[in-house]
Design a protein with these regions (language model features):
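A short SAM/SAH-binding and catalytic strip from SAM-dependent methyltransferases
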Residues: 211-226
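A short glycine-rich, Lys/Arg-flanked "PGG" loop and its adjoining helix->strand segment in the class I
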Residues: 228-243
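A short acidic, Gly/Pro-enriched loop at the edge of an enzyme's catalytic core
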Residues: 201-213
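Conserved alpha-helix/loop element of class I SAM-dependent methyltransferases that forms part
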Residues: 120-140, 156
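Conserved class I S-adenosyl-L-methionine
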Residues: 243-268
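Short alpha-helix
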Residues: 265-281, 286-287
């Protein structure tokens, strides 16, 4: 009996070892390090314009590797300059080369410290958004991601993107973009991803660029500091006929101790958000409302005890 028990344990260990080897093999396929460094492809220079004067931008002092600009600057006749740092285009003064922090550790800490219900809500919302995006023909389309962060959304859909679309990831945190770029550089197959570090109102893109607008809480994050509804400010960047896939942080109620000042609260209400989407002439294809949440993680310090939040997700289209 003892011998049979030991044999069974050996068999179990071998099965676990096989599973582990298979998992590691899958991981190595997905994260196989490529020699190519992602930069700004020479073929996409025509999508840029100066955010100050709308002038065309010219490449100066460029270091180019396999058709990708990895260092250098784009300059405008008005004197505005856009530095390219490690393949990321920067605009305005908000993008400083912050001292690199270990975002991998931060993500791990965040997952362990965040309320399970909140994480499940993030995951469900992400899967819903992915399903909606996959319903569209993305061939030769430009996708504009407003507030890409560390790329939870992009990494979830990366393999599904066709090789001939352009995905533009915009964030004002250079560290997060460099981290995301490093992750993407390890992925196969290769996709056309453009990284821009800029405040939302300083995005140096031509008008009518975006075929598909991805706004996974970018507007909500902007609303913590600004009364204007972000998508109205950026509407000139969207094509008259385009799709939008968005998610908004909404409050069920506000506490007297709320961190959201009274003048900014309207942008966190369902009626306001839905009304603004209507004003932009987007028609609903599908929508989703999450459960109410009482707790978040260490980065969700925008709501206090007694307040409940939820997310409203929207998928829609407008016809020019």
């Amino acid at each position: 009996m003892k011998y049979e028990k030991i044999e069974q344990e050996i068999k179990n260990l071998e099965e676990q070892k096989d599973k582990l080897k298979k998992a590691l093999n899958n991981l190595s396929i997905k994260t196989k390090i490529s020699n190519s460094i992602l930069g700004i492809d020479l073929n996409v220079l025509n999508v840029f314009k100066c955010f100050k004067c709308n002038g065309n931008l010219i490449l100066e002092d460029g270091i180019i590797n396999k058709n990708q600009i990895v260092e250098g600057k784009l300059i405008c006749n008005c004197g505005e300059e856009y530095a390219i740092i490690s393949g990321v285009l920067t605009a305005g003064n908000s993008c400083k080369a912050y001292e690199k922090t270990s975002l991998e550790d931060s993500i791990s800490d965040y997952i362990h410290e965040t309320d399970t219900a909140f994480l499940e809500n993030v995951q469900r919302g992400g899967e819903w958004a992915k399903k909606k995006l996959m319903q569209l023909d993305l061939n030769e389309k430009i996708l504009l991601d407003l507030g890409s962060g560390i790329g939870f959304f992009l990494r979830n859909i990366y393999e599904e993107l066709p090789g001939n679309c352009l995905y533009i990831a915009v964030d004002r945190d250079l560290n997060k973009l460099l981290f995301l770029k490093d992750v993407i550089e390890r992925r196969n197959p290769k996709r056309n991803i453009l990284f821009i570090c800029a405040d939302f109102l300083n995005i140096p893109l031509q008008n009518y660029s975006a075929d598909i607008v991805i706004d996974q809480s970018g507007t909500s994050n902007y609303s913590f500091e600004h009364k204007n509804f972000l998508l109205h400010e950026l509407n000139p960047l969207f094509k008259p006929e385009c799709y939008m896939l968005s998610s908004y942080i909404l409050f069920k109620n506000f506490s007297i101790h709320s961190h959201i000042s009274i003048r900014l609260r309207e942008n966190f209400t369902s009626s306001k958000v839905k009304g603004e989407i209507q004003k932009l002439q987007f028609q609903t294809i599908d929508e989703r409302t999450s459960n109410y949440l009482e707790r978040g993680g260490k980065y969700e310090n925008f709501f206090v005890q007694g307040e409940e939040i939820y997310t409203y997700s929207f998928f829609g289209r407008r016809w020019g």
